Design a protein with these regions (language model features):
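Bacterial N-terminal signal peptides
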Residues: 8-17
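Scaffold/interface architecture of coatomer-like assemblies
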Residues: 21-700
Length: 700
C-alpha cells in the first residue's frame, strides 16, 4: 500500500488507548523563544504563494514545454515576476516536493527509494445524492463503476463520498476496487430527497419563480393543473387549489434550501479532510444541479467556504450533471396534471436546467476545473478530466501586501505571451494560504481527526509504519485474517540507538464495527538517513467470516508526540468447502547482509533490486494425484513486463493436498526501479480449475 504523510486515523479502541497513553504524559513546558527563533517565525511572511495553471490548445490538448518567460502573470492588473516555475505531473514522484518548494518551504526528508516512487493520482467522487433523481443515480453508479474497472490506476487513491452520508464507513480513500464497489452499492435513493411527489409536480425552480419572482401567470397555471389533477370542477374549488399551490411552493423552497445547505456542508467537510492529503486532488461533484441563492439563504457564503477550502487544499473540482441529455420531468405530462394548452409552464420553465446548473459552473470555475454538462457520455467526461488534470504548471510569486496574502484573493490573471489561441485554465485564488505573521512559538504537534475520509496527518517524518494483510483457511471454510504491522525509525541526525514505540491496532468490518484489536510495546532500532531501515514487526491473527475488513495501525513513540499510522483493506472471499483455492501471498525479502542470507516479512512491500522476493501461498483441496501448474506474472500498470516459465508441481512437493503451503523465490535484478504487481495463478490440471492472487510491490 502506498505510504503518504496523510494517514488514516485509528478510532474507537485505538484512539481510546492512545488518549489514555497521552494523558499519562507530563505537559511539555513552552520554551521562551530566542531572538533567532522569533526572526524565523516572522521570516515566513516572505514565502511564495502558488498558482497552478493548465494550458490547452484549440483542440483541448495540454500544451507542454512552455518556458517561464512565456507566462504573463497579472496580480491586481499589475505584472508580477514569477519567482518559481515548474511543469508538474499530477501524482508524480516530485509533485509534493515541488509544491513545498513553490511555497518557499523546506523539503521534507525523502523517503528511502523515493526517487523511484510512482505516487499516483488522488480522485474523489462527491455524489450529491440529495439532488439526484432515480435515473441519475443509475447513471452515476454505471459511470463510477466504469472508472473503477477501467480508469483506476495501480498507484491511484480514490474515495466515493455522498452528501447524505449513506456510504458510512466505506467513505474512505483506498486503491482497493472491492472497497470502492462496496461503497458504490450503498448509493441509493435518499428518502425525502425528492421533496414533491404530488400532482402536478412542482419543481424547486417553479416554486422559486412563484414565491420569489412573483410569477402570477405560472401560479395560475399550476392552480389550473391542480384542479385537473384532483378532479375539482366546482368554481368554489379554485380558492382551495390556490391555497394548495401556495402552501406547496413555500414548503418546497424551505425543503430545497435545507437540502442545499446539507449538501454544501458535506462538501465543506470533504474539502477540509482533503487538506491533509499531499499533492493536487481531483474531485468529481456529481449532481442534477440545485437551487442557487435564495432570499435569506447563506448559499453564497457556503459556496465561498467550499471553494476557498478547496483552493487551499489543492483541489480541482469537475462538476458533472448526472441528467445527461434527459428530458426534465416538468415536461412529462404523466407526472403533471395534463397538457398545458396555454404554454405558460413550458415557457416559464424552459430556463430551469440552466438555472440549476449555475452552482455546478461556479464550483468548477472557482477551483480551476470545468463543468461537464448536457452530455450522456459521463464516462468520457471523467476520462477527459483525468487527462486534463494529469499535468499542470506551477507558478510561485511573492505577495506585496496583506490583501494579496488572503487565501480568497482572486485578482489573478495568467496569459501566454503572443499565443491568444491558447486557453489558460486556473483557479480563482491560489494553492494554500501563506502563514500569517506571528511571533508565537510553535506548539507540539497534535493529531486532529475528521468524519470525512478519516484522514489525519502524521506528526513525525522519522517514525514510519506499514501493514501487510492476508488470509488463510483454518479448518473447513473458516478463515483467519493475518496482520503484520511493521515499524521503523530514522534519526534526524547521526544518532542511532533505539526508541520505545506503542503499536496499537484495530480490525473493522465494512460497517465500522470493531471485530479485533491488538496492542504491543516494542523497541525499534533507529537508523541514520543514509542507512537501510531496521524493521520491527507486530503480528496479529483473528478468525473471521468472509467479508470486507479494514485494519488500522498507529505507532506512537513513548515519551514524545511522534506518531504515525497506516491502514489497509482486505476482502476475505466466500469459498465453498472442498473447492480448490489458494490463500493470500505472504511475502518476504532475502538480502545479503554480513555474508549470510537474511529473510524477513516485508510489510512495506518495498524491495531492493539486489534482493530476492520470497512468497508463500497455501494451496487448498488439490486433486490427487497432485498435478499443479504455477505461473508468475509481473505487471507494471496493466501491462505484463515479465513472465517466467510455468512451474510444474507434483505429488512429491505437496504433502497434504487439502492444505499445503508452497514457497517460491523470484530475483528482482531484472526489474527496473518502479511499482509492480506480482500475480500468481495456480492451476489444478486434474480438476481444470485455477485460482489467482495479486500483490503490489515497489522495487528500488
Amino acid at each position: 500500500m502506498r505510504r503518504t504523510t496523510a494517514l488514516m486515523a485509528v478510532v474507537c479502541l485505538c484512539l481510546l488507548s492512545l488518549n489514555a497513553y497521552a494523558q499519562k504524559k507530563k505537559p511539555t513546558p513552552t520554551p521562551t523563544p530566542s531572538p533567532v527563533e522569533q526572526d524565523d517565525v516572522v521570516r515566513i511572511s516572505t514565502e511564495l504563494v502558488q498558482t497552478d495553471v493548465m494550458v490547452f490548445d484549440k483542440d483541448g490538448k495540454f500544451v507542454s514545454g512552455l518556458k517561464p518567460e512565456e507566462f504573463e502573470l497579472l496580480v491586481d492588473n499589475k505584472p508580477q515576476p514569477i519567482n518559481f516555475f515548474e511543469s508538474v505531473v499530477t501524482g508524480g514522484k516530485a509533485e509534493e516536493r515541488m509544491l513545498r518548494a513553490a511555497g518557499g518551504k523546506k523539503s521534507s526528508q525523502p523517503v528511502e527509494g523515493e526517487s523511484t516512487s510512482e505516487v499516483g493520482r488522488t480522485v474523489l467522487f462527491f455524489v450529491n445524492d440529495l439532488h439526484l433523481e432515480p435515473g441519475s443515480i443509475a447513471r452515476t453508479n454505471k459511470t463510477i463503476s466504469n472508472f473503477i474497472d477501467n480508469m483506476l490506476g495501480p498507484n491511484d487513491q480514490a474515495a466515493i463520498t455522498s452528501a447524505s452520508g449513506q456510504i458510512g464507513f466505506l467513505q474512505q480513500l483506498t486503491n482497493n476496487p472491492a472497497v470502492l464497489k462496496a461503497a458504490l452499492e450503498r448509493i441509493k435513493i435518499v428518502p425525502g430527497a425528492t421533496p414533491d411527489s404530488q400532482r402536478p409536480y412542482i419543481s424547486p425552480y417553479a416554486a422559486y419563480l412563484i414565491v420569489e419572482r412573483h410569477d402570477r401567470d405560472l401560479f395560475n397555471a399550476f392552480v389550473d393543473q391542480t384542479l385537473k389533477a384532483n378532479s375539482m370542477r366546482d368554481p368554489d374549488d379554485r380558492p382551495i387549489a390556490s391555497s394548495m399551490v401556495e402552501q406547496r411552493t413555500r414548503t418546497m423552497l424551505v425543503l430545497s434550501d435545507a437540502a442545499v445547505k446539507n449538501a454544501l456542508s458535506s462538501l465543506v467537510n470533504l474539502m477540509r479532510s482533503t487538506s491533509k492529503l499531499p499533492g493536487r486532488k481531483l474531485v468529481f461533484f456529481i449532481s442534477d444541479g440545485f437551487m442557487p441563492n435564495l432570499t435569506g439563504s447563506d448559499f453564497t457564503t457556503m459556496m465561498d467556504r467550499a471553494t476557498g477550502i478547496a483552493n487551499r487544499s489543492s483541489v480541482v473540482i469537475y462538476s458533472i450533471d448526472a441528467r445527461g441529455l434527459s428530458t426534465d420531468s416538468m415536461f412529462d405530462a404523466s407526472s403533471n396534471g395534463g397538457f398545458d394548452p396555454s404554454g405558460i409552464m413550458q415557457s416559464r420553465l424552459s430556463g430551469e436546467r440552466t438555472f440549476m446548473q449555475e452552482p455546478l459552473h461556479a464550483l468548477a470555475a472557482d477551483t480551476g476545473g470545468r463543468a461537464l454538462l448536457n452530455s450522456n457520455d459521463l464516462a468520457g467526461g471523467i476520462a477527459r478530466a483525468l487527462d486534463e488534470t494529469s499535468r499542470y504548471y506551477l507558478l510561485g510569486w511573492r505577495p506585496e501586501n496583506d490583501a494579496q496574502r488572503a487565501s480568497n484573493f482572486s485578482k489573478i490573471k495568467v496569459t501566454i505571451a503572443g499565443r491568444p489561441d491558447l486557453k489558460v485554465q486556473l483557479r480563482r485564488g491560489y494553492l494554500g494560504a501563506p502563514p500569517e505573521k506571528s511571533k508565537a512559538t510553535a506548539q507540539p504537534t497534535s493529531v486532529e481527526t475528521t468524519d470525512v475520509l478519516g484522514v489525519t496527518e502524521s506528526s513525525s517524518e522519522e517514525l514510519r509504519a506499514a501493514v501487510a494483510l492476508g488470509y488463510k483457511r483454518t479448518s473447513g471454510a473458516n478463515m483467519q485474517l493475518t496482520s503484520t504491522a511493521q515499524v521503523s525509525a530514522q534519526s534526524p541526525g547521526d544518532n542511532g540507538g533505539a526508541i520505545v514505540v506503542n503499536v496499537l491496532g484495530a480490525v473493522y468490518d465494512s460497517n465500522g464495527k470493531a471485530v479485533g484489536s491488538f496492542r504491543q510495546r516494542v523497541e525499534v532500532t533507529r537508523t541514520r538517513a543514509n542507512e537501510p531501515p531496521v524493521y520491527t514487526n507486530v503480528n496479529h491473527q483473528v478468525d473471521l467470516p468472509p467479508g470486507l475488513y479494514q485494519v488500522r495501525v498507529i505507532a506512537a513513540e513513548r515519551g514524545t508526540n511522534h506518531l504515525t499510522g497506516v491502514m489497509d483493506w482486505i476482502e476475505i472471499p466466500k469459498v465453498k468447502e472442498g473447492a480448490f483455492s489458494i490463500s493470500s501471498l505472504f511475502v518476504g525479502e532475502i538480502t545479503q547482509a554480513g555474508g549470510a542470507a537474511q529473510i524477513g516479512v516485508n510489510a512495506s512491500r518495498r524491495f531492493a533490486r539486489s534482493s530476492r522476493l520470497r512468497f508463500t501461498t497455501n494451496i487448498y483441496n488439490a486433486a490427487t494425484p497432485v498435478q499443479l501448474g504455477l505461473q508468475i506474472k509481473i505487471l507494471r500498470g496493466k501491462q505484463v513486463v515479465l513472465t517466467p516459465p510455468e512451474i510444474t508441481v507434483g505429488p512429491d512437493k505437496i504433502s497434504n493436498p487439502a492444505n499445503s503451503p508452497y514457497t517460491l523465490e523470484f530475483p528482482l535484478s531484472a526489474l527496473s526501479p518502479g511499482n509492480y504487481i506480482l500475480e500468481l495463478t495456480v492451476t489444478d490440471r486434474t480438476k481444470k480449475v485455477s485460482a489467482s492472487q495479486q500483490l503490489s510491490l515497489t522495487v528500488y
